[in-house]
Amino acid sequence: MSKYCCNIDHKRVVALGGGARTLVISAFFIPLFFLSSSEAYSEDGIKSNDRIYNRGGDIGDVTGIFNSNTSAEGGAAIYNTGKIGNITADFINNEAQARGGAIANGSAGVIGNITGDFIGNISSADGGAISNEGAISAIINSNFINNTVKNVDEYEFLQDDVYGGAIYTKKDLNIIADNGVSIFSGNKVDDDGVIVQNAIYADRGGIFSKEPVITLEAKNYGQIIFDDQIDGNAKGYQLHLKGDKTSEISFNNSIKNAHITLEETNVNVRDGVYISDNKSLDVKSGILNIANMNSTAINYEKFTVNGSININSVDVDLANNSMGHFSADEYGESNGNIDVKGVNLISDSHDSATKVLFADSSYADTVTYSGASHAYSTIYKYNVGYNPDDGFFTFVRSSGSMNPSDNFNPSVLTTPVSAQSGAYSTQMQTFNYAFQHADNFMSLPIFERIALKESGRYAMTGSAGIYSPLLTRIENAGYWVKPYVSFENIPLRNGPKVNTIAYGSLIGFDSSIKPVKYGFDRVLTGYIGYNGASQNYSGVDTYQNGGLLGGTVTLYRGNFFNAITLSAGASLGESHTMYGKDNFTMLLAGIGNKLGYNFEFKDGKYIIQPSMLMSYTFVNTFDYTNSAGVHIDSDPLHAIQLTPGVKFIMNTKNGWQPYVGINMVWNILNKNKVTANNVRLPEMSIKPYVQYGLGVQKRIKDKFLAFGQAMVSNGGRNGVSLSFGIRWFIGK
């Protein structure tokens, strides 16, 4: 900073600007004078990095910026054994080779209020920013950032250990946030390379000295935030947390060796372990909010609650019958409230029902449980309850539901759910749509099919009034494409109700019709496909994307047809659970056979076509470990499906071919063994269901055939499946 104006007297010191000198104020000398390595007092005033050395003197307020001062003694910016008024200043990058990187207040020192920011100060003894052995009225709306106390080898004669990354005190200390913010962050103790994030260390002056009292007061919407620990002498010290209901004091690091008292204000503790290593806890009033308590007890010499403690989550170790809780050698009279808002199960019980102690009988009736009625371990689901009469939580694994999947964490059910409602359902869609040539060709009357095979044209029938479109090339080879999508919910047997969307597209090529032995005609079809699916159940979202290859052989003889298809593919799955993202791979294959017969009426204007589809599906989900660390081991799924059905087809004069279809679907042998950490999961399957719907196809000129279908499912699958497509013919 450039030149400034200042006043210097016994009542006030204003220090602004830049320089490198020492102002010495002594009760034993009459004059005031400056000392530095090369100059005495001059009239140009005090500059911003001038050092104040008050040896028993009495001065007023200090205002300024103390930047980059160094001192071989304590207090690189201010050393005080006398009296100083209020200090309003920032202390930046000052370094002392003894106590107090910025300020050293000796045992006889008295300082008023301190307001300012302490950033990057360093000391080689106690107190990276402030060392206090005297009296400081209060530190108000001040931030302590990245201050360090460091035990340097060349200064080991000073002391063996160093304390107080930001502040070291042997006397009472008041830290206040009054409609402002005080942050302690990045402060540390570096003791021969052992680094501890520490903000304040409270020490005792001697054998007969009393416990120092550290008071943190937040008021008028003030906030005090500690990212670094508060520690003190093992004999203990007092830590008073006070303020009003508009303000907060937050701890993101530990408090150690303190007798903690809370009054009126709101105190936030990120983890219960941060307040576990202390002498006592007395919540007189106000609210103590604890984000999480681990599964071990917090033991105090004395524990009293007359305010409120809110615990967002408590870890429960069912395998060892323990959970986080407060215990003490002595319990004070408690009339407050401890509210547990949730539990986190970190292990599973050996039994279906487990009781775990949470509260001593002296305060058990002050505890309430306001969390969910159930909780999940990584594998199981438990019903949760609390008994205020004895202080025990109960965890019951049996949910009372007739559905065994209700006893499990949904995150471990991804494999059986995806195998059934994802991969298996996708394979069923393939079987439904792979018989494209038979679906198109067998919608024609027999005389037209014969005409196609023999002459490549339909014969005109004169005035008979029989449907006879011209110049169709369905007997020729052709390409086809058939996209599809379905929107369904699937109430799996022994499993959850799954909302699923399946989508994909098949692209195929049909050969021309060729005669073979025994009066049959044959068509060969090859196809490739993309398939995708998504499932949602019990808060779990799962997605699969994959592809397949397949081939179909279709045989025709008169009004009879038989088609057999074989396909294989793979799919990559991604599941999002309460623990994160899981990835898995699925291999699927299958064979299906569809046969049917046409019963024609009125020269083929109306056709009734009963059919039977039989299929076998193989789905293998490769073993994987999910994001909760549970190993999922799956045996392959082997499934057989039987689908009898009937179609009612109408051939119109203008070339439209509408139809109505109905199918009954049975799934048999469609269960697979899946384990989670060797725990057998429910074997799920799709219940029988009925499909019904309508479709239409239309020949367009001489080159194309367009078709579409909508089918509704009820029973084991509920929803709608939509498909449409086009076939175009090649050749003359």
List each model region and its residues.
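Extracellular beta-strand/beta-solenoid scaffold signature
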Residues: 40-55, 63, 68-80, 95-106, ...
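Extracellular beta-strand/loop-rich repeat segments of large surface/secreted proteins
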Residues: 217, 237-355
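Outer-envelope beta-barrel architecture signal
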Residues: 475-479, 518-524, 558-564, 604-610, ...
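Solvent-exposed, glycine/polar-rich loop segments of beta-barrel outer-membrane systems
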Residues: 493-500, 538-542, 572-585, 620-638, ...
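Residues on the lipid-exposed face of transmembrane beta-strands in outer-membrane beta-barrel proteins
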Residues: 505-511, 549-555, 566-568, 591-599, ...
